[in-house]
């Protein structure tokens, strides 16, 4: 969300940014919001002017009442009363006019906010320009992708060989997009989360378990309306939504707060279940646990000064790379293009893991710099040493989301005999287990 003053002062730049995001339908909104803002500010001036006039008239009535009380001349009393009545009539007229203006002011304010929530954040100059994710740009690779000399089964087949997943039962219980994890697969799921938690704590992040629901005003503060509609589950009859990612309640923690600059940066890592309506397009790669309604995730967020956010962006995505490489999974960084950025994002990149089965990379983490967009919506301010306040910057990144992580892990550590090796960093979280041996082999 942009500052309205910035839009007023830089309409051409705002329009150019909209074009870069291939959202030309929003271009008329820039002129509309500038026009509405001018009317809004004029309303404010008129209301203040009327308030001043009303106060002046009300103040003038004081001495007139005093004179009227002491006056004995009937003609003069009538004249004083007439003046008081005229002042009262003017005060009432001003009050009626103020009520009209304040109603118009509220209407304008609502429309201005609606538009400002729709106009996208200014993207970073380094963001590649393109209409959709096919224009995302590979930046660099970490680790050598390996294509084994034996066939890699689909991830659910690997899990089934360990008696580690039951999607049929989950379908009967909750429908499509849910799963039961069992035995060593469930244990591996928890091991990855526990390792990621400790990995981030060792990086100096504070571990947090946040609320798994949030109010509507927090939802609107952390994400765009299209995202909200496509993602969020609402609790019927309640002003509560199930979180789609813990970053939302983590950032929401600071709503309407003024933070002491000396406490920044705030570096937090959180565990949560996540709930999402989206299931994705049907097809072979949509089977299994790649895109689901419920999953668990370890997240990282940063609240910092504006001048620090670019550096923190680099640190956050590199944390993900280091984490995946420590588990011996090849990854690459993919810079998201302008058309693939959500409206609140200044810059974003995906970390993608190598899939030996598909012989291509797939998304496992997403790192974003949101600038002051969330802070502006949620009123998260910072008080500097000079006593002045400014908006914080917020960033987030997936540390690890085990459903997709498990796919990458199982494919990259699968052996020809169907066993799965456990890298050294995970062995303490698996009771010292070095190799997972399948319960049975399909076929």
Give residue spans per PLM region.
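TRNA-recognition modules of translation machinery and tRNA-sensing kinases, especially anticodon-binding
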Residues: 27, 141-443
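N-terminal alpha-helical targeting/anchoring segments
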Residues: 1-145, 160, 164
